[in-house]
Amino acid sequence: MSETTTRQIHDAPLRLIAARIRKARREADLTLDGLGEIVGTSRHHLIRLEKARHRPRLEMLTKIAEATGRSVEWFLDPDVDPSPFQEEAA
């Protein structure tokens, strides 16, 4: 996928993004408070993201991806492999 745009975030199914944020956080063994501290947001905001009550901005999704070892595309595209972590390029 080419550079992720704000449009791609708006086009992606909100429930997919929410479920993958929760999955990534849990598989990275992070609490809501822990992830919030890393990405600079509140526990309450993360709960809203994980319950599909709010669509994340590109900047926030990028921070969550970095904190959990995922690619931004993994959160947006149902066809991207849902394996726990992206493999490092050799």
What are these regions (language model features)?
Residues 2-27:
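A short, Lys/Arg-rich alpha-helix, primarily the initiator
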Residues 40, 59-74:
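DNA major-groove recognition helix of helix-turn-helix/homeodomain DNA-binding modules
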Residues 19-38, 63:
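Short basic helix-loop element that most often maps to the first helix and adjoining turn
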Residues 40-56:
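Recognition helix of helix-turn-helix/homeodomain-like DNA-binding domains
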Residues 2-6, 76-90:
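Short, charged recognition helix plus adjacent turn
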Residues 19, 43-44, 58-61:
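Short alpha-helical elements of helix-turn-helix
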